[in-house]
Amino acid sequence: MAKKNRNKQQQEMQQQQQQHQAEFANEFAEGSSAEQARQQQQKAAGKRQKKNQQ
């Protein structure tokens, strides 16, 4: 009986994790273009800083 409950708990946790991942993926997809642009700006800024340091 205890084993059955443990399996059920694991399944529920996995379902919750999958749901979170799906929600995160959706949020990421919505924000990814803005995020990518920001990261590219940071990379470019980082390259400039490295050049300035040398």
From Swiss-Prot:
Sequence ranges of Basic residues compositional bias: 45-54
Keywords: Sporulation
Signal peptide (residue range): none
Site residues by UniProt (Cleavage): E27, F28
Keyword hit for Disulfide bond: no
Annotated stretches, region: Disordered: 1-54
Any GO BP: sporulation resulting in formation of a cellular spore
Keyword Acetylation in record: no
Feature: compositional bias, Low complexity: 10-21, 29-44
Taxonomic superkingdom: Bacteria
Biological role: SASP are proteins degraded in the first minutes of spore germination and provide amino acids for both new protein synthesis and metabolism. These proteins may be involved in dormant spore's high resistance to UV light.
Family: Belongs to the gamma-type SASP family.
Name of the protein this chain belongs to: Small, acid-soluble spore protein gamma-type
Organism: Alkalihalophilus pseudofirmus (strain ATCC BAA-2126 / JCM 17055 / OF4)
Lineage: Bacteria, Bacillati, Bacillota, Bacilli, Bacillales
Designated gene of the protein: sspA
